[in-house]
Each structure stands twice: as C-alpha cells, then as structure tokens.
C-alpha cells in the first residue's frame, strides 16, 4: 500500500474517530513483536556465479554459499573472492531444497557487475526479501533508527525519551530503505520520534523534519502496530488503523479486490454452462463495508439486476473481509457485472480494469468497466478433430497451378475490366496503390491471376500431410470476378479458374482419405455487383436485381428483394465499395428476406448444406464453414444456418470472422469457433520489440505478464470447447505476412538483409512454438512455413515459392507440428500459466488422472512449453507444487531431447535465447491421484479442533489445509498424515477455521481437496448477568441516550486474566414494547410510523469496561425514539456469534418532552422509472424546534422497513437496492428533536429497463473543417460515417444525444462524412480497435461519454498561419509558420527539417524577402517502419503545401521620411488629398495640467493614417505628467479606417523608467501599454500600434454594440508579442442589460467569435477587457435562457452567467437547475469565471485520467490553487457540498480582488456545528461578504449537495462583490 496514503488515512481516522470503539472483532493475532528465531533454517545463495567460488552453479547442496544468520530473520553472505564483471541470475534456496520454488518463488533475481567486485547478499526470512550490495546499502548498525518517546515504557522498550535505553530498534526487512518496528501497544495517547543511533544527534519528528515536533498517536484499543521510517525522505508513519466498528463514510479502495483469474474470487474459472453455479467474491478491508451488491447486465434478456451479497468471513490475518454471491443462469447469455459497495454515505464501484482484460479489477467513484462472464449452452461442443488440430489456410489462386487448362477460362473480371495474367509464378501481386510510382509495371486494375486452382491443392495434399496439417481452410472458391472471390457471382458454381464441381469433390475425397478436413469460406453479407443476382453489367442471362431496377420494377427479378437500391441508382454496399452490394436486412435480419433465406439455408439443396454433401456422399463434401464478416449479419441468420448444417453434418464447424471478443457468438446456438486475431495480436505485441503499425492496427511491446493477462482474458471468455477449437492464426489474407511484421520483406531492399531474415524467422519460430503448444487449432497461413513475406493486401497474397522454399524453416514447422500431433496433451490437455516474467513465458499442459480437459480418457501426460524472446539464454525455476508431483521426468523435444525432472517442488529449465522449449513427460509415468477424502467431520473444542474422514483408496497419506473462509486462502498445516484423524491444537479460541483435506499416494500424486468443514473453537461461557437497570421516566430526545447499561460475563480461562478476554463479542439488545398505555396515548400520534414492524430486538455492540473479579464487564447505551415501554438485555458470544448466552430482560419507560408538536409532512415527489434504481426527492419539512433527520421507508407489498436515514439538510435519496420488475412503495418520515414523526405521502414505482439518453461529447482538433459524425454499431445507422451528424458546441467540441437501451454494447468511431475522414491516433495511425462502451444509467436515465479525437485521416498537417496570398508590411522581415501535425512527423519548411516530438502545434520562423515569398511545407513520416512500411499508409501521412506571402516593397521610408513635409505651430492642422503628406499636429495629452503640445508627424497612405511621435516631446510629457496614464488621443489626426502610432524605443523606455502607462486613444477603442506589457527583447527601434475600424460585425444570435476593432502591435524591426495582457477599452452603444455584454474576438481558423469577457461602464458607454493577443474584437450583448428555469428562483443569475459563457446548459434548452453539480463541473465554471485556460493533465490524482473531459480543467485549477484534492483523489464526479463549493469560491474571490480571509471563527448559522472545522471560517467570511446565504430557518446545510442553481448564484455573487458586473 502507498505509504503516503497510509499516513493520510491515519490522520483522517484520528480526526474523525469520536466514538469509543466497541468490542473487538479481532482476527488471528499478528506474529510476536519480535520475530521468532529461525536460526535453524539454512539459507543458500545459489546461481550462475557459484562456479567462481569453487562450486557448481545452481547447487542447492552447497556448503560454500551458506548465508550467516544475523538474528531477527536476517541472513547475510559476502563472496570470499571477487566475482567477474557480467550478468548473473540467482536466488535463495532454503534447507538445501527447492521446496516452494526458492526465494523469490517466481523467477530469478539479476546481478549486474560492471567490474570485478565483492558482493554481499542479504535475505530476510520473515519477509522473504532478497537483495545484494549492487542495489542496496544498509544503515550502519550503530546508527539504526529507533523509537523514542512516551511510548517506550508502554511497549517495554526502555525509559521514556531515552534513546540510549531504547530497544525499539527498526530494521529494513524489505531492503527498500524503509525501516520498521512492530510492537503491541496498549490503549492510550502517546508521543514519539525516531533517532538514528542511541543519541539525540540526529532525530526526526512530524513530517520527517529533522529536530521536528513530536508525533502524536492515539491508540483506541490495544493493537499490534508497525512503525515505519524512510531513510531517504525521513518520513515516519504507522500502519495503525482503528478497528472499523461502524460507518465512517469511507471505503478503502486499495484493499478492494476481485480477480477473475483466481478461483477464490470466481469459481469456476472461465465461461460456465447454463444452470452451473458460479461463485463470485470481493475483498475489502475488514469491517469496512456496510453492504455489497452485485449489478449485472444480461446481454440476451436485456435486463439489469442488482442482488445483495453476503459477508462470509475474513482473511487469516484479519486484514480483509469477503463478500460472496452464488449465481446461475437458465439460458445462454453474456453477463456484464460490477460490484456496488457502500459504507454510510460513501458508494464505490468495483469493475474490470481499464484494459477490460479480466483478472484484478479497479475501484472507482462511478460505474466504470464491467467484468464479463459467458454462459453457454450445456450441450455446446465441437468435433474432436477440431480440438488441437493443425490448420492450413490456402488462398487458392496463389498456392499451386495443378491444371493449366483452366488458366484462361475467363478473360474479364468485374464488368469489362481485363484480368491481368501473370505467366511468371514468382511475380509479385500487382498493387494499383503504387500506380504512378517509379518501377510500377501493373495495369492499375485490382484483378490479376496466377492460375492456382483446386487441382493444385489436391496435388499438394501429401506435402500438407507431411507438414502435419489435419484441417485446410480455403478462401472462397465460388464463381467470382476477382482473384479473392469475396465478391460472389454464383454460389452454386466453382469458379472456372479454380476448376469444376468434380475437381471439388475429388479434392474433398482425397483429403478425407489422408485424414484432412476442409473448411470453406462463406460470404453471405454481400455479393458481387457483377453477379447473376445483381447483374449490374448485364453479363449474365436472366434478370438481375439491378437490371430490374433499371427497367423500373425491381421486383421483376427473382433476386430483387435481396437488395436495397435507391431511386438514384445508389445502393447499400459493404463499407462503401460499390462492387459489393449488401444483402438487405428486413426487420433487423437477412433471414426475413424469405427468398434469400431459402436459397442459403432452408431449401433442401440450400447453399449452406449443398457444399457439405454435393452428391449424396458426405465424403465428397466439405466439413464446415468459415463465415465472412459475421458480425455484420444478424445473429438469428446464423442460428438458422447452424440448424441447417446440423442436418447434414452435426456440429460442423462454423468459424466466425470476428477480430475482437467473439464470446456473444459462442453461446452454443450458432458458431463454435472464431478466427482468433486477438491471439495473433498478443503474440506479436510480445515479440515485436517496438511500436509498429501492420496496417490493421498499432502494436506496442508488452512483457510476459501482460501477454498472459491478455491470453487469459480469451481463455476465461470462451466456452471450453470453443477455446480448444479457436483458429489461432499468426497471419491471414487480411494481414501483413508475419515475417514482414517481424521485420523481413524479401521484396524490400531496406528489409531483406540476412540479419533481418534471421531475426524475423527467430521470432516466427518463437510464435510457432507457443502456437503449437497452446490450446486451439494452430493455423498456418500458406507459405509462412516456406519463408514467404509480404506487406498488407495485396502483397500478403504472394505465390507459394515452390522450388525456392526456405527448407530449414519448413523442417522446423514439420518438427513442431509433429510434436503437437504426436502428443495428445498438447491438443486437449488442461492449461496453466507456469511462468510469466519479463522475456520468458511458460505454460503447462496436463492429462492427469487419466482424463483430459473434457473428461475423455487418455494416458497420463504432461507438457511444459516456454519461449524466451531475450537475446540471452534464460534459466527459469518453475514452482510445480500445484502442477505436478516431484519425480516427473521430461524431455525437451526441440532441443536434443535434454532431460529434466521435478525435484523439491520445482523444475529448473534452460530456455535458449530467442527460442523455446517443448518438454513432454516421459511415457508410462503415473500421474493419477487418489480420490479426495469424503465425510470430513470437525469437532470444535476448547483450544483445539478434531478432524476425521473416510479412507481414500490408494492413499498413503493426507495433507491438511486450513483457512478462515470457505472456498480458498488455504494454508497447509500438516503433510502426509497417515491416519484418518487429526487434532489441530494450534488454534485461537473465538476464531473461525475452515478445513479441507487432500489425499496423496506413494508417488506424491495429490488429489483435489475435500469439501470444506467449519469449526469454531471456544472457551465455554459459564455465566452472564448483573445487567443494570435504566431509570424510569426517561425523557425522549435526540440528545438523550440512556445512561450506560452494564453487564458481566465469565468464561473460565478467558475472562479471569487481566484485561479483555480476546474474541468476546458483547451486544446490547433493545426493543419497543407496543400496546402500552404510552403507545396508545402518545406513540401513534407522535412517534410511530404506520406499517412498520418494530417488534424485534435491535442489537448494538457493547464496549469492554474492565475486570470485575473473574468477570469481564461491558457497557453500551442507546437512544429511545418512541414514548412507552422498552425492554433490553445483553448477550455474549466467544465463537463468532455461533452461540449466544443472554442475560435476563429488564424494561423501563420513556416519557414525552415539552415538545409535542409534530413536523409538517414532507411531500414525496413521484419518481420516474429508472433501471435498477429509484431516485427519491421530497420537499423539506418545518418544525417549531428543528428537524433532526429524515427516515426513508420501503415496502414491496408487506410491512415497511427503514432502509436509510439522511440528515436534515438532505432532500433526496437514491435506492439502488432494488430489482427491475418489482413494485415498491416508499415514504419519507420527518423526525424532529423529540422524535416526533410525520409521514409523507406514499409513492409507488416499479424500476425497469428504460431507454437511456446517451450524450456523446467529443473534443476534436481545433482545425476540424467540417461536421463530425458518430459511426458504429448503432441501431439503424450501422457503421455509416455520414449518419448521426453531431452538433457543434464550440470551436472544438461536438455533441450528439442518442437514445439507447441500457446494457447495449456499442463499438464506434468518429468520422467526418466518410471513412477517408475517420479519426486517427496521435501518430496518424489507425486505432488498434474500435472505441467501446456499455450503456449504463448514470442517473436520471442519462449517460455522458466524453472522448477526444487526436487527428483526422485526411489532414496529416494543418497550417494555421500564414494564409496564402497574404500581404505584410515592408518592415516585417520574418514570419512565424504555425501548424499542427502528428507525432513522429518529419516537417520540412523551405528546406529546414525537424521531427515533431508530440501530436499538436508547431511553430517555425521563416525569413521574408521583398515581393512574393513561396513557403514550401512538406510532411512525411520520419520512420516508415512505425507504419509497417505500408506505402498506402505512408502516402496518407505525406503532404505538400505551398503558401505565397507578399512583403511590400520599402519605398515610402519611415519616420519623417524624405517625402514628408512638416510644419509646426500651436493647434495647427493640415489635410490633403495626395497619396502621401505630412502635418505636425497637436495631440491632446491628458495630465493634471491638461496641457497641449505638438508631439509628432502625421502621414497618410490611403485609409491608413500614421502618427510618428516626436521622441523628445513625448518623453518630456511622460516625465512631467503626474498621472500614471499618459493618453495620446489620435481621434483628431484625421479620418481613416486605420490609425497607427509609431512609438520609438526610447519613448517606451522612458515610460517604463517612470512607471507610466502609454494609452493610445482612437475613435472606437483605446489600448494601454504598461511598462512590462511587451516582450522587450523583441523591441529594437520601437513599435507600431495599429487600431483599425472594420465596421459593424455580421452576427446572428448576438446584438452588436460596437464596431469590429482590429488591434495589432508590430515592431519596426521585427515581431512583438505580449508579455502580459494589455487593457483595451471599446466604445459601445446602450445595452438592454449591461450584465450580458461582453467582448468577443474573431478566430480566423474557426471563423467563429469567441468569448473574452470584460467590464461595462454604462455611464461612459465603454467596456474594458484584458487582451492576451492581437486580434479583431467587438462587443456583443448575448441573451441566453433555458426552458426549465422560467419559474426558478435563480433564473436571472443563470441567464446572466450563461450569457457570459460562465455556465452552460446540460443541453441547449435545458439547464437543470435542481440537478446536483459535481466538483469537476463547478471547477470548470470557476475557470471560465477567471478566464483560466485548461492545461494538459499530468496525472496528479488517481481518480482522474487523461482523456476525461475535466482532466485538463482539473490540472489548471490544481496549479492555480483553486482545488486541492485529498492527497490522492480529486473526486471529480462527487457531488460538491455547499461548504466545498464555498471554499473554492472564496479562493476564486481572492484572485478577483485584494481580499484576505479574516479570522472570524464561528458563523451565525443555526447549524454552525455541522460545518467542518476546516470550512467554518471560510463560510463565515463568505457570509459576511454576502456571497453565501443560509436556507430558511437560518440553516447553511454545509454537507448538502449544491445544485446547479446554487452554483450559479454563488458565482454571480463573486462577480457582483468583486465589482466585475
């Protein structure tokens, strides 16, 4: 656990723990404070360096490398001689044995020596940690840290505050420089510090400060506590966490766990059959959770269900608790589940990890990812010949030409396009993508043929048989105009180029004779447009659908209803290819097109059945189908397809082409296998070694652990028969050749070196070793085994190199497939991961107990398959204790039959570099264990548990296992017990123990474990009593609990020693006795709730008080909430509540207080229907004294039960403990301070699945030129990039709202109207997979999804500026080119190149000559290998841009100029009509004396008037002015659209030196230049300040109040930028509401006006704002309202803030003022208020991740000090409380004003004590300023959730109080 987090939690507990803790639910005690002495254990350092010490490597029997025992579990060994420089593997062996795998148990440690060196090794037995002196330097013994303080005497560690006496010396048991000491600390308050050594010379206190203050610790109950000291940071902390005994409104995320790969958490592993029970468990910190529920979505029934879980126990060490639920399902389906965990007001969700791979999940504040569970038909199976087969995929045209007579059977391909015939078999396939490039010789048409045919395949059957192939998969072979045949022209015919039906039948027969099965490729989503069915080109007799359409009646064609043809002749086609018209889906399914369904499925000779039995002889037919783009065909079509082919060949393969998770296809009603592209991608990612795009997606390197996680994800999702029959491919006709993926391409001179080939083949062999050793059908793509390489389609379809094969590679494939075929264990043996670390991955396969994974009988056998991607040999030690017994021997069948054996629970294997091993157990070994013991009986005793069981046949001994919870966490406590009885005397009374037993035979074969047996050893409780009497006439009241109630217990041996008897549970029970006189007189009137059964006892824990003789005394109290008689008693148990002993029952009476007035009734609003939740809201009650709380009651038809209580300031509650389809009744009861109760009305609601309003928000690049569309698996818009156009929200945000069913799994992408404009990743790559989301109800039947698009396919580079044909002034000699391109792009601008290191904006300065300048910009990938050297992909990312910029000729001079004339004189002016002219003018200088002086020269050029300031006069005026602002008024210098003031640098310097601002005042605007406004290093001679009037803006939805003012500042000798904002004032006309007026700037990139802000001065008719850049500005009045705020109290402020773009609606028309606002939403509002821009998120908080819509806002707010988080979490999705909102608001107020917080202390609110201590003074200040106000009755409600209306009100208050509105 994170040490900092530990500290934070410790602090938070001490702050919040106010109640005295009750009886301890303790667990197994910690080990003794001082570790048990283990000197008898012999520890050896063993490894690859022992031979240098006169020993043999890995010798566990060595006496040379025995480590010296140093005490307290520490061992040490120093080499007697120096070890040579190099790298070594090592580990620790115990007692000269590998039992348990050594230390560490998984893998070896590495020692790297740069020079010859002595090395010291350390091993800690207690923590099982190992290190060496190259990695670790310990603190010297005399300086070891130790505890000093008042705690010393309490723990028996010397005298208080005396370091020289302290025996609490800390040790570094984990060798991580964190030292620790564990002690049993009695209850009490203590102070302590840590000293280094036995003096005060170096000591550390609170916060790790040297000589710092004492550290406080309050121990509320006796506890074993570990103290920690970090030698690097000097931080000091403990693991102390008070025992959780009640609700603390907190859940410890780090302790939550559910692991789908661990049978303890999910049993059984993987997919389950219908009606099979699956047990799901989740772990939490002990006593942390109030409740746990599971929420799951049924993918078939489309329903979400929530069910409660049961707490089943705790871990053996007492740290964790476990919750469980058992589920079963009566139909095949896919289940998506997550856990809902509650503790008081805190709710957490635990779902799958971010990668959604299963295994260990992740806790979040909101619903995140679901775990997946597949439930399949119990009769689902696959043919045995599929399981473990070796498959071979053939692209017929490129395999072999066996019949030359059909070579030219056709001459035309599609339409009238010719077929390009290749007479040279070794030609490369024509790639029309390369047309126009040097060396291209093709015809540019996608049709070329190499004459391969069915006869050719038949001729090569012997070759395939010799290769080990048992299944052939053929790409399509039916009549088609193309070479790939995925555009079928006639399903009833074999393509003439491939042969005849007779050739087909002969191939089938011949293959079957050789034991080879054949799978056909079926394409039933689309046909060819050049087919007998569509007949677009009229080449076929008969009337095709298109021909009939052309003739005006599509129905005239027998195929007319197969297609959708639009009135303009366009038609639905596959992914936009008009050559592939799609079969119509009628009412959601192609099967509903009757003629199509009959033709393919239903008819006697339907295509699905015919080719499995074409002539009545099954031997002449194919054996199954691979089905193209199956996920683009309705599923019910495939279920009918399955039923049809089952009538011909039962369970014939249906292999789905599905590139992702195909679990929904494998439920048992259709497909029974899938093309396992996931397997391919995982293997490539493990072996690739670099990021690489293979044309189908991006590959990124992973290690062995991630590989295992991914493969396990597939294993757990697929039904076992399907998993063992998956088509595990490394390549196909749709992917780059595997050798080329690994870096070799024979046709590419950059990739065809011998070294590249050798490396690629090594990686291919590695992949094949794992493929051939893994469950499933190992698929070989034709030619891979012969060394064929090639890029993506069409290059991956090269011809087989007959006569030029790589025979060495072929021999490898033959050998490896032979090993697979000859060893059944590699086909159907079970699967277990044995090793997954770094570069090495190893799996185990077993047939044990004479059965394989399917229960089929085979001889016992085992295999270990391992691959090593490292360039160095690896020796791995595999723990086999749970895999196989000792003594089993193996031979490595691919490495010279090297022998291995299991010894001491371990096998040590040498795995060669860049290679692997295939270990097969030697024949004849007995791996069959006895049956597990039965009839296990346990008897609980005092300090012991007795066990007995029945003898198992063949057993020679038994192992005894023990846990604290059923179903797992077992620890072996006894081995090889020879009797059938056992006494466990090593138990602690009062704890739960779970036992299980296994049987072992004489060889060591161990059975599975028996059923669990549970025991509770305990002391017998002899007596309970002395219950004290509560005083009668107890006055009712929320602050009037009973006096303490005492009782005593005696249990001999437990209570008669000093202190609390361990594991004793004491509880006080109390109940209201109805029917009393008080009840009839008062109760029903004042205190009761109608329909509630309160007749039972309520139990609360009692607290240990002390010893009374031999008895232990306990106490508790309660607060009666009804008037009348109450009964109470105490009960005790010391065996976990299995048995209780109770005292006698006593009673007392409760009487009314003076307050007999009931609260007013709350009104409960009718909730809307939601799925799996009920959202309640009510109007608050009032009371003459005060409301205490609200109680929520629920009934499902019977009595009402109280389900929750909320505070008096909360008026809403969400009940998620409901089941869809069940009707519930609710009421809310208001409770006042005397427990007077008033009920609300009753509402009735039935939660049910409802459509969810799903809001997709996407942030796109700011250069996005056109509309954005959402494409994916959406109903009625499947993968249509031109449908579902999104609404533009702002410059780079688009949104669309859809209605989708909850639980729907959506895959999607963003595009801009076509697939040529689809989104890309930051490298410009295709995304490896589609975006995925499960639709859930996030509240109010809504869901919001926030995404980011990084790039667009068609825009590899975008140039913001300059624009082409742009003209610039003559004084501009350089220009900035600003653009945006992808990461890794090589950008060249006018010959200068650079590589873009990140996706996004770049800038580059270019020099300008006078006249026309051509700026040439080129972009291309810097490293083509990142894109697989795919020329098509590289071409997409390559672009040239040329921009013309005209720099004006310098012919008018500068300053006074030779063409200027000047005159001087007071108040003189001259105007002229020439193109140039000059006038000396008087400019009005505003200062205290209001003097006027002549200060410059005016020149006019067209509409541009320039004033050049006289430096001497201007400086004098600046120096002499008494005002801070010196105004140069240029309104009187003449009429012109543009006015320019030239200011020399010495004028600017004078202004800066005198602290004066220069103000340029023009006709419609003024600009103030402060001394540090401009970047001084960019100013050489001075600046030109230009103010240009562009007239009235053309806008809609806004009221224009000013002209457009274009402000620029340029340098006389270069560009000038702003160093800080400058103040600009615009003249405006009168506004209807000045509060809604703001300045906007025009963004030329987006052609949009964007909000800036500003402050209106209505009296002067101006608005002033701070400009951060030069642009065109204008002032608008914007009046924004929403439909749902018409009657809302905050209508005015919401409209004002919306008009100022500070708050936004949930939609364009809905604000939702009463909806609670989240912390992230309020933070975003504050940022907009302060005009703080988002910043790129850098990962400060664990609950915020990059890509979240609020991530960059959180970053900006955090850096600005607006938010703080809680040290780890920002809690962005939590509803913000009123006190949290106030705190953030006041930080913003401080940034708006000069405000400093006063120390006021308490507020004047009536609920001041409810305000958190940290917030009270902040709230007091805010109230004093009038920024916040209380609610009615002077209540602030600090913990109440703030609404969106309240958020708007407080922000408006900030604006108003800071004078900004």
Swiss-Prot record:
From which residue to which does the signal peptide run? Answer: 1-35
Catalyses which reaction?
A: Endohydrolysis of (1->4)-alpha-D-glucosidic linkages in polysaccharides containing three or more (1->4)-alpha-linked D-glucose units; Hydrolysis of (1->6)-alpha-D-glucosidic linkages in pullulan, amylopectin and glycogen, and in the alpha- and beta-limit dextrins of amylopectin and glycogen
**Pfam families referenced in this protein's UniProt entry, alphabetically:** Alpha-amylase, Alpha-amylase_N, SLH, X25_BaPul_like
Coiled-coil segments, which residues?
none
Q: Does the keyword Disulfide bond apply?
A: no
Bridged cysteine pairs (disulfide)? none
State its Enzyme Commission number(s).
3.2.1.1, 3.2.1.41
**Main location as per UniProt:** secreted
Residue intervals of the Fibronectin type-III domain: 929-1021, 1158-1252
The alphabetized list of GO BP terms reads: carbohydrate metabolic process
Q: Into which EC class is this enzyme placed?
A: hydrolase
Name of the molecule in the record: Amylopullulanase
Instruction: Please give the organism.
Output: Thermoanaerobacterium thermosulfurigenes
